[in-house]
Amino acid sequence: MNYEEILQTVRGFCAREKLLDGKKHLALAVSGGADSMALLRVLLELRETFGYPLTACHVNHGLRGETADRDEAFVRAECARLGVPLTVFRPADVGMTVPPHAGEDWARRLRYACFAQLLAGGIDCIATAHTATDQAETLLFRLARGTGLHGAGGIRPRRPGYCRPLLGLTRVETEALCAAFGQGWVTDETNESDAYARNRLRHGAVPALRSVNDAAEENLARFCEKAARADAYFARQAEQLLSIARLDAAQTARKAPKAKAAWRLEPLQDTDPIILEAALHSLVAPVRDAEEKYIRLLAELVERGSGAVQLTDTV
């Protein structure tokens, strides 16, 4: 696709998913990489169409020494050049310190702590630069670990406080967009390391799939969209099921005095397995990552009618 076609793809995706409608103040998470720099330029182009004020934020995790400082300096310079207000975060700004063996999970928690501070301070949406390539990698990663329909839905285009305008583009297309704008970017050297499972998929599985079909990433991302729609439907059915099965306060106090809530087994045992799975997912998700193995264990428990499953140290 050429520049105009890529821009139109993003515009159409944002309009279809209602990602930018009515945003009072939009903040873009900018790492300095090609994806986030492409999103910065796209959001500047679309600002007039959707009418949102735009600011940027950058998180210096403090993990990569001089190259992290280089990335921060690059983002500062580019935002100043483009006239975009920028907020830079470091761990101490949100009351966090770098642990001895900080990894991807810690870095993600830091980023979302920074985003939460912005949302609490008046920003009503954080735009992140996830792409169709990220979507494909996420799907493969979850399938390899074991996932259900909810996990197969991948990265959602939006959730409260967040939107992902580039989910319709591949990483090749974001780099092409940067080239069309004459926009430079920086490269995080940790993305080249196969020490991380996601990077091994990025360097091995995704290119192998692309060799089978040039549109492999787009097709995997499209599958995620379909899975997410199916998951949303079954979640609505599950909500109705749990409402029917739930005991009232007096019944709960009598049958399960230590429980905050309880449900009758019969409706759960009589329902379709995929609706039961959706119901169990909604119950598990608030207390831990709803991995497939826990849903499966709980489904077996419902079928048996008695027993226990340990989900966390306290649940």
Regions flagged by a language model, labelled:
Residues 191-198, 217-228:
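Internal, active-site/partner-interface "lid" segment
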